[in-house]
Structures are given as C-alpha cells and as structure tokens.
Amino acid sequence: MGDVIPLKVNFDLINVDDEPFELELLRDPYSLKSWLRYIKTHEGSTLEKRVLLFERACSELPGSYKIWKSYLELRVAHVEHLNPYFHAEAFASVNDCFERSLILLHKMPVIWKLYLQFLMKQPNVTKIRCTFNSALRALPVTQHDDIWDMFTKYAEDIGGLFCIHVYRRYIQVEPRAIENYIEILCKLGLWNEAARQYEDILNRPVFLSAKRKSNYQIWLEFSELVVQHPDHTQNIDVEKVFRAGIKRFSDQAGKLWTYLAQYYIRIGDYEKARSTFYEGMNNIMTVRNFTIIFDAFVEFEEQWLSARVEASSGNANDELSIDFHMAWLEKILDKRPLYINDVLLRQNINNVDEWLRRVKFLEDDSEKVVQVYTDAIKNVNPKLAHGSLGKLFSEFARFYENFDDLEQSRIIFEKATHVPYKTVNELAQVWIDWAEMELRHQNFDAARKLIGDAVHAPRKSHISFFDESLSPQVRLHKSSKIWMYYLDLEESVGTIETTRKLYDRVFELKIATPQVVVNYANLLEENAYFEDSFKIYERGVALFSYPVAFELWNLYLTKFVKRYQGTHMERTRDLFEQALEGCPPEFSKSIYLLYADFEEKFGKAKRSISILEKAADKVKTADRLAIYNVLLVKVALNYGVLATRTVYEKAIESLSDSEVKDMCLRFAEMETKLGEIDRARLIYIHGSQYCDPRVETDYWKAWQEFEIRYGNPEETVKEMLRIKRSVQTKFSTDSLHIAKRAAKIESAAAPMDPMEQLEMEKSEGPKALAGFVLSKSNPQETSKITGEEN
C-alpha cells in the first residue's frame, strides 16, 4: 500500500476464475448487478486488479453513482495516509478520477463533499477555491448549506484575505453569518470593516442573532469597538449611529451615552465629551442610567484633573485653572441629588413630592425657588397629581409669607382655591392653610370670613359629598374636615352664639359626626347650657345607629345622672328605658349596670335588683356571668345570703356549660357554710355532668374534699366515684367533648423534650392504675375508700 499504483491497466490480471463474470458481461456489458458482483468477488484482490475492474465498470457505466462512489473511496483510502506534498502525482491521479466522475455526477453532493474533503488535505488553495466555486455552481441552492459550511471552515483555517473574500460572499447568501464575519474581521484587526458590518446590522429593521444576542448587546459590542479603535472608524458617522441606539433603547441608554462620550475622549475632543455627558444626564429617564452616566462623567473629570496637575508647569494661570476646575467638579458632585430629581420629574412630571423636594434643594436661591414653584403649577395635571397638589400651593404661599409678602401669598391661595383637585379634602386643606396663615398674623376676622365663604351654600343643599361628577368646589360645603376646622376656629375666636349657629348649620347639612355631637354637647355643658347639651345628645343618638349610638348613650346617661342625680327620677328612668329599647345585646351590659347603679344610689334597691335580673336575660351570653356576679352581691347585701339561692339557680340554668362549673362550686360552698350538706351534695352532683374528670380536675378535687370531710366512705364517697366514672364514660364517647379536650390539652401543654418527659415520669413515681385515685393527703384513707368500692 506504500507504493503508488499507475493508472495504466494490465489486462493480463484477468485469470480463468473470472471467466464466468467475463462471459456474463459479454452478454450484457451494462448490467450494474453483474459489475457489482464481479467487484465484490475481488474485494480481497490486489489494488491493480480492483482498479482494473472499477475502471472497466466506470467506462461501461459512466453514470453509475454507486460504482463511482465505491471506486473513489477506494482511491482515496489508498493515498490518504500519504504526504500530499511528496506524492503529488498520486493525489493528482485521484483528483483526475474525481473530475471524470463529476462529468456526469455533478449533481451529486456526496461526490462533491468527498472530493472537497480530499482536496482540503492538499496544499493547493487555488484549486480548492475553484472546486468550491464549481460545486456551488453545479449544485442546486437547496444543497449549498453543507458546501458553505465546509468552505467557511476551510476559509477560517486559511485566514487572511482569502477568509474575508469567502465570508463576503457567504453573508450574501446567509445574512445571519455576519456575526462570525465580524469576529474574523476583529481577529484580523480590520476594525473599520467590522464597524461597517455592525452598522449594517444596526440599520436593519429586524435582526435575529444566530448567537442569541439581543439587539442591545450588539449595540454595546459596536460601542466598545468604536471606543477602543476610534482612529479606524473614521468613515462612519459614529454620533448618528449612537443617537439612533439611544432613541431606540431609551430605558437602557446610560451605557450608550457613556460610550459616545468616551469616543470623543479617545479622539481628544474633551469639550464635546463634556457636552455629551451633560446631554445624557439631562435626557435620561431612569436613575440607574443616570448613575452610569454621572459616575463615568466624574471619573473622566478626575482623570482629566490628574493629568492637568501632572502636566502643570507651576505658573499662576495653571494653578488658577486647576483650582477653578476642582471647585466646579465639587459643585457638580453637590448637585447630584438635584440631577436625580430631574430624572424623577422626567419620569412623572405630576409627582408633587419631587417638586417639593426640588424646592428644598434650591432653597438658598429665591429666584430659582420661585421658578420651580411656577413650573410645577404650570406642568402638574391636577387630576393626575401624585401627592397633594394643594400642599404645593400652600408651600408656595408660605414662601412669600416668610418674606412678609402677604398679598402675594393671598393671590396664590386665591388661585389655589379654583384648582380642580382630585378630592374635596385636598381643597379643604388649602382653605385651612390659608386661614392658618391669616391667624399667624393675627387676622382673626379675615380667617373666619375665609372659612365662612368657603362653606357658604344654600340653606337646603341636596348635593352629595360623594358625587364625583361634581367639582370639589361645589361639594366643599359638605366637607366635614373644613367644618371641623371652622368649628374649632369659631370656638377659639368667636362667641358662644356664633358657634352654636355653626353647629346647628352642620346638623342642617346632615354632615354631623359623632365627634361633632360630643364637641357641641361639651361646649354647651361648659357654658352651663345643660338642657341644650342633653338635647344635642338626643339628636346624636337619633342620627346614629349602634355601635356609635351606644357611645353617645353612655356619655349622655352618665352626664345626665351626674347633673340631676335623683331629682328627675322618672325622666332618668325614661332615658334608660329608651336607651335599652333598641340596644343590641352585645352593647347593653354597660347601660344595665349604669341603670342599676343609678337605682341603687337614688332609687330603690329592689328596683336595682330587678334591673339586674332583666339584664341577665337580655345581655349576650358572654356577659351574663358578670351580671350574675353583681346580682349575687347586691342580693346578699340587701336580702341576705339565703336570698341568693334563686339567683344561683337561675344562673346555673342560663349560663354556658363552661361557666356553670364555677357557679356550682360557689353555690355548693355557700350551702356548706350554711350547714346544708345535702343541698351542697346535690349541687355537686348537678354540676358534675358539665365537668370532664380528665379536664376539670379542680371541680372533682373540691367535691372529693367535700365528701372526705362531710360524707362517709360506704355511701357518699362510693356514689361520687360511680358518678365520676359515669361522667368520664359519657365524655369519652362524645366526639364534641373529645375534640374540645384535645384542643385544651394542646393549648395548655407545650411540647416536651423526650429526655425531660422521662425525668418527669421518674420524679412523679409510679402512676395509679385506671379506675384508682391516688391520695395526696391521706394514702391510707384513699386505699380504704377504693378497697371498699371494689
């Protein structure tokens, strides 16, 4: 295999064994199957014999793809391990075979690819280039992809101008390959051509990156290229391209503005760079982008100053210029918050808070402050304002007030009262601020007149405060905010008569709040108009429903009782009955207790107890225990302890199960003190049905101590234990009680560490078996009881 086989065929290689194949081919020399069988039979023969057969077959069947492909693979395999430089003739012979095959098989891409792969191993760039061109001309466009892939890879391996020319042709066929082309241009240092190709990409309306890069990334790559190699991109209108990108990516333009400025820095145009930085900061729309530009600007100025200092010759002019520039840079740094404020206002010009913040930044310059206020009032849309637009006007007026220019302040307030604010309360605040200004300068009458004019309206107004279709100015007289201020103002500087008229006007407009009712009543009370004060409370409870009415009744009744005490008994009782008539159970407890206390102090004890008994039926279930506690005390004080039995009995009937236990314990304790042991035992028995022995241990402990002291083991103690087992069985089978018990145990017992639990069990000692009760005080007596029970 190491020797080169000449193409000249020796027909003496045909031997007797080949006679059947030869005879068959004589009969039909164009039989493909016959030739293939013949060739296959001699796969193990010498190369000369196989070449002879392939050449004869190709001569008879020059258009057979199968024969040519096998033949070419044979010839390529024979020389592929050889050095093409030292065996050029052998490679040329194989090349000739490929050329002959392509005469009729020029539409077969596999043959072309096999040929091109073979050629690319040979040092003949021109022939390879021509063969690629021939393949592209011969094959249809749909089959060009594989050829171009081979062509471009080969071109990249060769490099230089050859690669450039190949890619220039390729990107006309496949525009998305332009990114690879740009990378090659950059590797070769052809920066101007790379920039021109970037410009071509950026000018396209739509570009889909083969490398999955966003358009913004491509802009940044172009920017970096231009900034790093400004001297090689002179044929491109760099500023125009950058500004197109800034316009296109307005939300991410910070880096593009910075790159444009750096481009001017690289070409030495420092003033143009500064103006670019300024323009960027004045047009950017986000704080993030502003920060990028500002930081780059400051870095540039610091580097420029450092360079000036190093290059300074030490003369006075240079020192003065450097000092001036340093002061200018410090001023720029100090103005950073103001620049950020500019950005935020560009984002939303209706942001009132930012306008006010801008005033604070410029508070040392009166002219600029006035200009800011003027611009804000001119540009902010009242219906779109973010924040309180009224505050803007008030602060503007306050600015002139600080300079004692009250006339100008009044002009601003006058204009502010005609602005169509989003809410009525905002307009009300403007009027209040105006009045406050007048008060600060002792113009009390002017302040009263202002607010009076603001709330002036027809005697009978049917306008709804919540009607958004009407302007705030039309609805202002229904604003409780401005009326509350007006009332406070009138109380401070007016008379009782004028103040009463205003309060009455508030009631006429039907905008009275609970606070207005209380304030009006207190005002009248302070001026000794007690009956009028009580009338206001009556108007208040008629206006408002519960729970507001409950608070008003509480105040009304308390003040009425305090005023008249026991002198108007029937009237006071009527008021209490009126208060309780429509009072929901959840609010009636306080009124009943107040009523009972009144009767006890100024009326009859019997009537007080009767009220408490009625309260026990009327209040909500959760409040009944408190009522019964008071009732028990009152009955015991007035009628003796024996009289409390009926109260206890009624309480046990009406209280909830959880509250009955405590009531039974108290009842039994009372009977025990009276010596009524049997009655006490019956009470314990009655209460036991509500007490789970595993949960309500206090109840059963109290009963056990009672039986130990007053009972006998043979009967009462045994009966108690029987009842206890019965009750426990009942609770064990009641799913509702099981759930309650589990919840109670979970809430009462925190999770315990296993080691702590083990230590606790050891410290507690042995536990009693189920059904037995361990005694803490007298083990012998307990064992006696349990033994007798068994």
Swiss-Prot record:
It comes from Schizosaccharomyces pombe (strain 972 / ATCC 24843) (Fission yeast). This is Pre-mRNA-splicing factor cwf3. Keywords: mRNA processing, mRNA splicing, Nucleus, Repeat, Spliceosome. Involved in pre-mRNA splicing and cell cycle progression. Belongs to the crooked-neck family. GO terms for cellular component: cytosol; nucleus; post-mRNA release spliceosomal complex; Prp19 complex; spliceosomal complex; U2-type catalytic step 2 spliceosome; U2-type prespliceosome. HAT repeats lie at residues 12-44, 45-77, 89-121, 123-157, 159-190, 193-228, 233-266, 268-303, 331-364, 368-402, 404-440, 457-492, 494-526, 528-562, 567-601, 639-673, 675-709. It is found in: Nucleus. The keyword Repeat applies. Residues 769-790 are annotated as: Disordered. Residues 775-790 have a biased composition (Polar residues). GO terms for biological process: generation of catalytic spliceosome for first transesterification step; mRNA cis splicing, via spliceosome; mRNA splicing, via spliceosome. Belongs to the 40S cdc5-associated complex (or cwf complex), a spliceosome sub-complex reminiscent of a late-stage spliceosome composed of the U2, U5 and U6 snRNAs and at least brr2, cdc5, cwf2/prp3, cwf3/syf1, cwf4/syf3, cwf5/ecm2, spp42/cwf6, cwf7/spf27, cwf8, cwf9, cwf10, cwf11, cwf12, prp45/cwf13, cwf14, cwf15, cwf16, cwf17, cwf18, cwf19, cwf20, cwf21, cwf22, cwf23, cwf24, cwf25, cwf26, cyp7/cwf27, cwf28, cwf29/ist3, lea1, msl1, prp5/cwf1, prp10, prp12/sap130, prp17, prp22, sap61, sap62, sap114, sap145, slu7, smb1, smd1, smd3, smf1, smg1 and syf2.
